[in-house]
């Protein structure tokens, strides 16, 4: 019986060899432990801003409220910012700033009170800003949400 054998090209054999050597190293960097909090390992910590003027802070928060990356969160936060940002105290601005450092989907689920998907952490349970956002998200005026014009800030 005639057996046909195929030999891999040298480049592919070298890649396969490299892959066999690297895979154990790569796997060692990832945890299969379900208790391991992957988010805390990959989360980028916010820049601490020192001596930022209140006007500059408001301008930055407007931008961060509008440019989240997830449309649902963009609409909620930008509308909320247009309505409330001008009247917030410096302490409320700091709290809102800290909230914007959370993950987008977490903010969305907390604001829409979807606690089963993403429970509110202790640090946000008594937050006045989160309560205002939740009240805003109920849309009691039954308006269609859209990105507010920049003049509304």
Curated annotation (Swiss-Prot):
Pfam families: Sdh5. The keyword Cell cycle does not apply. Gene3D superfamilies: Flavinator of succinate dehydrogenase. Its main location: mitochondrion. It is found in: Mitochondrion matrix. GO terms for biological process: mitochondrial electron transport, succinate to ubiquinone; mitochondrial respiratory chain complex II assembly; protein-FAD linkage; tricarboxylic acid cycle. Keywords: Chaperone, Mitochondrion. InterPro entries: SDH, SDH_sf, SDHAF2. It comes from the Eukaryota. One of its GO terms (cellular component) is mitochondrial matrix. Belongs to the SDHAF2 family. Plays an essential role in the assembly of succinate dehydrogenase (SDH), an enzyme complex (also referred to as respiratory complex II) that is a component of both the tricarboxylic acid (TCA) cycle and the mitochondrial electron transport chain, and which couples the oxidation of succinate to fumarate with the reduction of ubiquinone (coenzyme Q) to ubiquinol. Required for flavinylation (covalent attachment of FAD) of the flavoprotein subunit of the SDH catalytic dimer. Interacts with the flavoprotein subunit within the SDH catalytic dimer. PANTHER family: PROTEIN EMI5 HOMOLOG, MITOCHONDRIAL (PTHR12469), SUCCINATE DEHYDROGENASE ASSEMBLY FACTOR 2, MITOCHONDRIAL (PTHR12469:SF2). This protein may be expected to contain an N-terminal transit peptide but none has been predicted. This is Succinate dehydrogenase assembly factor 2, mitochondrial. It comes from Candida glabrata (strain ATCC 2001 / BCRC 20586 / JCM 3761 / NBRC 0622 / NRRL Y-65 / CBS 138). The lineage of its organism: Eukaryota, Fungi, Dikarya, Ascomycota, Saccharomycotina.
């Amino acid at each position: 019986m005639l057996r046909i054998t195929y030999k891999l090209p040298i480049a592919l054999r070298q890649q396969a060899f490299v892959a066999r050597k690297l895979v154990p190293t790569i796997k060692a960097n990832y945890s299969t432990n379900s208790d391991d909090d992957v988010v805390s390992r990959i989360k980028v910590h916010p820049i601490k801003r020192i001596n930022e003027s209140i006007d500059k802070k408001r301008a930055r928060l407007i931008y961060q409220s509008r440019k989240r990356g997830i449309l649902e969160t963009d609409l909620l936060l930008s509308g909320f910012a247009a309505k409330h940002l001008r009247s917030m105290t410096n302490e409320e601005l700091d709290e809102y700033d800290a909230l914007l450092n959370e993950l987008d989907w977490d903010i969305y689920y907390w604001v829409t009170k979807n606690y089963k998907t993403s429970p509110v952490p202790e640090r946000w349970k008594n937050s006045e800003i989160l309560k205002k956002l939740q009240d805003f998200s109920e849309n009691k005026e039954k308006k269609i949400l859209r990105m507010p014009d920049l003049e509304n800030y």
